[in-house]
């Protein structure tokens, strides 16, 4: 399996002055649109999250159509590696399923010539709980059950807790095989943040991009998790919905405010609409509890926000102009195809704050 995937789209023709004045306002776009020029350098470099890989490919294609000759070379090495490469100045921005952590904020500011780096949520997605349990087409789990499965306190599928959640299913006595991301992955942090928020009485193992459960087997990248689940009877793992759909995998329902909730575009959208920010300003870190603990009916709570980590200031003009162009197009035109790719389009209240932050990049 390749260690990195380069996503490059777009022809190499120049971008004329007409394109420099166009606005990123596609037919049917809602909310603030911002202004996207086509100035700046032709190629941006970025690295990080596998969760946003397919979204970046879509955004890249749309940017190349909107601004011919523009492209992003994006390498999917994982959120942790992406943040490290950004801080080291090796890429123009990072893709990460988690914002910068406390001990990265200072080094990131140094990389940005003494200016703060911003976490900009450009993509929302969902975490699919893929499993290998023949004869059980509609598995239901709860946050409490998940916490106990991924910490080794529920070890067989016919455990009374799981049986009570699945009264119509004949769960086997198969041993449960948890599969987690072995590489530093933002989706692991999202999963553990969800368990901490939704099942605090059952998950005390902690959070972070490294799996803390202490049980199961690790696999690298979403494709590795899917391969491991497929190859292991009784396995359960977590991947982004788009990867699960591409692989044709079954995924579990999660109990919510109105009972068992399947993972669909609508149920994920209901959770994302509850998104709130931790603070004012342009560093747009989300309060994940607003989604993980939502009381909205028919809301699938295990969602993720994946960020683009950028310098607020400190780029050269060529890089700054290109980043603003790419992000503005992605936040507008690029949202149209996200549902088909397994993502959730930006809610208007998030998009409004995002456009303001993008416009403020210098």
What residue ranges belong to the model's regions?
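C-terminal motif of bacterial Sec signal peptides marking the signal peptidase cleavage site
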Residues: 10-14
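Second-shell loop/turn segments in exported
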Residues: 42-49, 71-74, 116-117, 131-137, ...
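Residues that flank catalytic or metal-binding motifs in active/ligand-binding sites
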Residues: 123-125, 174, 187, 234, ...
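Sec-dependent N-terminal signal peptides
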Residues: 1-6
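Flexible, solvent-exposed loop/hinge segments that line or gate ligand/substrate-binding clefts
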Residues: 100, 203-362
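Extracytoplasmic ligand-binding site segments that recognize negatively charged/polar headgroups
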Residues: 126-130, 136-226
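Sec-exported extracytoplasmic/periplasmic mature domains
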Residues: 57-69, 87-91, 99, 131-135, ...
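N-terminal segment of the mature folded domain
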Residues: 18-163, 223-228, 239-247
């Amino acid at each position: 399996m390749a260690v990195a995937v380069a996503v490059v789209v777009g022809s190499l023709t120049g971008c004329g002055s007409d394109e420099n004045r166009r606005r990123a306002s596609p037919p049917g776009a809602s909310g603030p649109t911002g202004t996207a020029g086509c100035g700046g350098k032709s190629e941006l470099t970025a690295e990080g999250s596998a969760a946003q890989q397919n979204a970046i490919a879509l955004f890249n294609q749309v940017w190349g159509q909107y601004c011919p000759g523009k492209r992003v070379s994006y390498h999917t090495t994982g959120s942790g590696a992406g943040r490290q490469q950004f801080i080291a100045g090796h890429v123009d921005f990072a893709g990460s399923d988690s914002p910068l952590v406390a001990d990265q904020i200072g080094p990131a500011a140094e990389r940005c010539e003494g200016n703060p780096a911003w976490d900009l949520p450009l993509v929302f997605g969902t975490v699919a709980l893929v499993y290998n349990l023949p004869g059980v087409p509609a598995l239901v789990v709860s946050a409490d059950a998940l916490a106990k499965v991924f910490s080794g306190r529920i070890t067989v599928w016919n455990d009374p807790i799981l049986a009570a959640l699945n009264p119509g299913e004949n769960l086997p006595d198969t041993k449960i095989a948890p599969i987690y991301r072995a590489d530093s992955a933002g989706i692991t942090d999202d999963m553990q943040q969800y368990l901490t928020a939704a099942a605090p009485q059952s998950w005390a193992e902690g959070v972070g991009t490294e799996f803390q459960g202490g049980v199961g087997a690790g696999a690298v990248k979403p494709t590795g998790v899917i391969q491991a689940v497929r190859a292991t009877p009784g396995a359960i793992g977590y991947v982004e919905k788009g990867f699960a759909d591409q692989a044709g995998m079954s995924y579990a329902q999660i109990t919510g405010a109105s009972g068992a909730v399947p993972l669909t575009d609508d149920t994920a959208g209901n959770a994302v609409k509850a998104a709130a920010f931790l603070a004012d300003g342009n560093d747009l870190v989300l309060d994940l509890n607003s989604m993980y603990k939502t009381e909205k009916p028919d809301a699938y709570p295990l969602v993720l926000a994946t960020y683009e980590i950028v310098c607020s200031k400190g780029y050269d003009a060529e890089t700054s102009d290109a980043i603003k162009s790419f992000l503005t197009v992605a936040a507008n035109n690029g949202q149209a195809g996200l549902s088909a790719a397994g993502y959730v389009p930006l809610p208007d209240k998030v998009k409004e704050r995002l456009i303001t932050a993008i416009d403020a990049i210098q």
